[in-house]
């Protein structure tokens, strides 16, 4: 079943720059049965656990996070680029391969003690998710897991995340 889903994701060579093979998930998302199966398989892992909020990371994490929140009867929290959220925010600046980036979350989005599932489409180097984990922990929430649709194993991004709190449906 996983191989069926993996086969739907197309490789785009030299995107966004030469030497990179981009995993294009849009082919899976636009196929209704495959998208539903992907969400169901990830959600199944958390059925029976208390999940209060699902955090979706801009932008493709919204696609997965909102669907998981619906399946798990949880609220949705958005993590966005600076200036995109209308109320007071916490922000986190983190290092990229070349430079830095910043993410924001509403200050009142997560209450202390809430159990939070963080969702994104892809785990690559782990830098973005590590920043989100720091923000969620600073809000005194408990992380259920960091879950991903896909993971690029050779980049070892999970080493930057809490041990035992990483789940990827499809590994490349």
From Swiss-Prot:
Record keywords: Cytoplasm, Glycosyltransferase, Purine salvage, Transferase
Protein localization: Cytoplasm
Pathway in which this enzyme or protein is active: Purine metabolism; AMP biosynthesis via salvage pathway; AMP from adenine: step 1/1
Any single GO BP term: purine ribonucleoside salvage
Single annotated GO MF: AMP binding
Domain of life: Bacteria
Reactions performed catalytically: AMP + diphosphate = 5-phospho-alpha-D-ribose 1-diphosphate + adenine
Enzyme class: transferase
One CC-aspect GO term: cytoplasm
One Pfam family, short name: Pribosyltran
E.C. numbers: 2.4.2.7
Subunit architecture: Homodimer.
Family classification: Belongs to the purine/pyrimidine phosphoribosyltransferase family.
Biological role: Catalyzes a salvage reaction resulting in the formation of AMP, that is energically less costly than de novo synthesis.
Name of this protein: Adenine phosphoribosyltransferase
Biological source species: Pelobacter propionicus (strain DSM 2379 / NBRC 103807 / OttBd1)
Gene it is expressed from: apt
